């Protein structure tokens, strides 16, 4: 008979940013243990609050199924001697399995015949194995820094206070992490019953809510917070900024969410909204509120962990807590503006970017030069790009950014506007860090794009140049920086060559770099970002590899090629031409001599080779405009027309003729044919 199963681990406050991950891993690990043990069930559900991890298993079977274990013995020709008597090997095997040789069955396969013992193994009772399974599931949680507590040797992410393991109404005896299983559950720290007993797994989690004032279901708490915040914002005439990461964190901080609203003085709205929001979200875990035009309102939403008879006191307390932080932001903003950004440039000499690569002032000088170089190639204003590069890191020396680090860039923009800098320059100071994460917006075209690429390329080339390429960890976020550069080049269609950009960036370091292979390593590293990016976009890996085989170092050009090959692959002729290219490649690989593209028409004998030679010559001329403009889709569509003469050639012509001149001429024809395709991609790599 199947029953509900419950395990709850009561702890001290768990790290909020890890709570969901821990709970999901616990459930996944336990489900894997059940699968390994072959114990049937109808699903594992996890629960998590700041002070507990729990899971329930629906309709968990009371035991493993009985099973037959086949134990193969020695081969028959080894098990018996010439007289047909059992050998010592056979007798020893039989004795070890509690049978006689005569009781053994035979296993016959196409490889021979063996002795066989089929043992009937009774399934274990679920109650006898679940404690060990739960202990394993908990031991394999992703905990970076486990801790010890008291005088115990056990380790966990936080001290464990209670353990409850119920199978239906049966309390499963056992100990995990030094705590014995009991029926005691702990309620909310400040509301409900502090402790109470649970009689059966079916009562969970309802009993926690009814008696303990704890909503154990994570998704329920999260939904309450979102819905309550949206309603509260509407009542304020605004829209709540419910960033999912913050909602998750708040959900992980409360056991009984109560959504409340508060306000702050309107005078603080003179401070850039980003600084106020940084304080509200980062420090206090509040949700900012905006009006319909996305202007910050002097209100915020917060989530209390208790129901109070005097909610006004809680509101006033939160307002009192946030006020000094907002006042600090106001003070920093007013103080910083008394000094132009450019005046802070010398201060960058005192800030180290990287010991071998120099100060942030050194980096600023390189960014300035590289941004101007890039701007010239993409048609952006060179002087504005250089100015933005010069000012790019100056806000790091302001009080605001020193105190509120996440406001770097955006505060530079506000201060630049105050100083009267050109709008493009000011905006670039903020957008230099874009895209900040996967899926983030790109910097604006022109000046912002030039500065953003210059900053990222300087970091990538510099770190590779001193031999610190990322392996497991990536402390300088070089993968993200590389993808950022690639996205800007691809999505804006900038036909810039990475080889040129990297060489220019390298030259600006003077003799600081020690890695002689820095340019090639950076090229390979950046091109290595393409497969995952384009696979995520829906392109198959063989299409990507077909293009990468040509080592295209212009990202925008790579993009055009991938899309063209994807279009080509859908054509009726694609499969046959891909196979033909593979065949051609294999044939050419066996030839040791040098091949050009000059076909000797006088040596063409067969009608099929004459037809192919003529078709290739005509095609080569017809494709010149498409290749010149990078219209690879048009080029491949035209190349698809070669299928018929290619098929006829292989059906009727012996390439590896006995006559050396004839053979070389035919190989030259195939080489010219293959090179037409290779100007775009190696389509021989396309799979069926």
UniProtKB/Swiss-Prot annotation:
MF (Gene Ontology): arginine-tRNA ligase activity; ATP binding; glycine-tRNA ligase activity
What is the E.C. number?
A: 6.1.1.14
Q: Say yes or no: keyword Calcium present.
A: no
> What's its catalytic activity?
tRNA(Gly) + glycine + ATP = glycyl-tRNA(Gly) + AMP + diphosphate
Where in the cell?
Cytoplasm
Chief location: cytoplasm
The record's annotation in Pfam families points to: DALR_1, tRNA_synt_2f
What do we know about how this protein assembles, alone or with others? Tetramer of two alpha and two beta subunits.
Q: Which family does it belong to?
A: Belongs to the class-II aminoacyl-tRNA synthetase family.
Which named protein is this?
Answer: Glycine--tRNA ligase beta subunit
